[in-house]
Each structure stands twice: as structure tokens, then as C-alpha cells.
């Protein structure tokens, strides 16, 4: 494998097709020594999200904080629904579990694992505990 620095062909720019992270592309190498190429074609995308612009995702990890800021479960549910709609496997990462004095982590974990989602618990500056 090698890295080739590429720009989109003028035709793609005229059609307002912009390559994004995750795109599968066909390229033409124009300078082997300088590792330069041109993107000739962008293959059909399996999925696409606008913010941040990415394509062909297979999974996405939603990181939520148990405290500071408090987890917004409605927002998390909306993000999960959007991921499912786009055919992207959501994974939930609950961070700052060391600050969970009310045992909220266990409740959140139970809710989401019961409906089939993978939940990872973390203390970002220490370790990851996989479920």
C-alpha cells in the first residue's frame, strides 16, 4: 500500500461531486516519483453523513459523558436512529464512569444492551472496560 496525493478531476468538480473521507475512488497516477494523482471516479456510496462529511461507514461510536456534561439520552437516541437509517452500526461509549455516584451507567448500559447495542464504559484518562 502507498499514499498518493490526489485532487478531483475537473469533471467531478463541474458536476459538484466532492470526495469525502471514506470514499472509494478510481485514480490515475500522474507522477509516480512525487506520488501525485487525479481522482477520475467516485464509486457509489453505501452511505453518507454530512457532519462531518464521511462516506461508506460501517460503524460509528457515540461517546457520551455520565457527568460534566450530563448525558442527553434523547439526543443519543436521535443519533442512533440516524445511524440505523443510514445503515451504520452504532456503538455507545459511556465516558467518565468514575464520576457516576448515582449508578446511572448501569441503567443506561442495560437499556441499550437489551435492545442489541454494544456499550463500552470508559474513564478516558485510565482505561476501557468492554462489555
Each language-model region and where it sits:
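Conserved beta-strand/loop subsegment of P-loop NTPase cores
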Residues: 57-64, 86-97, 116-123
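Canonical P-loop GTPase G-domain recognition
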Residues: 99-131
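Residues at alpha-helix caps and immediate loop-helix transition turns in enzyme cores, especially N-
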Residues: 72-75, 104-105
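Conserved nucleotide-binding/hydrolysis micro-motifs of P-loop NTPases
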Residues: 31-33, 66-69, 96-101, 125-128
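N-terminal accessory targeting/assembly segments
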Residues: 1-73
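Conserved, well-folded catalytic cores of nucleic-acid-processing
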Residues: 45, 63, 67, 79-82, ...
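Histidine-anchored nucleotide/phosphate-binding helix
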Residues: 74-87
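Residue-level signal for inorganic ion chemistry
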Residues: 22, 83, 95
Amino acid at each position: 500500500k502507498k499514499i498518493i496525493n490526489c485532487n478531483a478531476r475537473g469533471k467531478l468538480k463541474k458536476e459538484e461531486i466532492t470526495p469525502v473521507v471514506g470514499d472509494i475512488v478510481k485514480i490515475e497516477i500522474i507522477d509516480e516519483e512525487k506520488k501525485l494523482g487525479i481522482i477520475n471516479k467516485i464509486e457509489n456510496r453505501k452511505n453518507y453523513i454530512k457532519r462531518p462529511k464521511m462516506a461508506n461507514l460501517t460503524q460509528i461510536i457515540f461517546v457520551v459523558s455520565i457527568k460534566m456534561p450530563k448525558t442527553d439520552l434523547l439526543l443519543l437516541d436521535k443519533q442512533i436512529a440516524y445511524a440505523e437509517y443510514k445503515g451504520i452500526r452504532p456503538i455507545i461509549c459511556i465516558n467518565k464512569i468514575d464520576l457516576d455516584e448515582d449508578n446511572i451507567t448501569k441503567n443506561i448500559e442495560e437499556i441499550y444492551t437489551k435492545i442489541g447495542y454494544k456499550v463500552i464504559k470508559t474513564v478516558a484518562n485510565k482505561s476501557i472496560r468492554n462489555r
